[in-house]
Amino acid sequence: NEELESIWDSIEHSMDGDASHFWVAESDVVDALVRIALHRPQLPKSIDIAGRRRWSTQQTHHELQMLYDRTRAGSTGQFTASLLDQPASPKISVVPIDAAQQDMRPSLGALHNVLVECDGHGWQPTSPLRTAMMVYLAGKLND
């Protein structure tokens, strides 16, 4: 799939040591937006939506690479046990707390409060990032 190869190349070329992201699954975002649309609460001027956990570019790359390799192997019939014999993801390491090096997660307070007002449940993303990445890859392969 040329589009996936292009995305993959851009990820590999943009890997710098300090970049990080607070990924969240599309399904969790859609769920929050539908809850807001159904209940029509009073909204603040802006609402940030983000995942709870910080993912470095390297962790994201590692996870996508593993899933992509498995997907390609499965689609070509060349699936081996070695593709399943990988450590659990993500590769998490202890990072010293240094405000200069840490990206600040967007505040989820406004989103949480609006969702509590809607139905009492607040912001509770339920989809693991690995699942969201698999859905993304499947969609790209089916395009």
Predicted regions and their residues:
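A diffuse structural propensity rather than consistent per-protein peaks
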Residues: 25, 55-56, 107
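NAD(P)-dependent short-chain dehydrogenase/reductase
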Residues: 1-35, 64
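Mid/C-terminal beta-alpha module of Rossmann-like enzyme folds, strongest
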Residues: 32-103, 125-143
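Extended, small-residue-rich solenoid/repeat segments and analogous flexible loops
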Residues: 99-100, 117-120
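Helix N-cap / beta->alpha transition motif
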Residues: 25, 82-85, 114
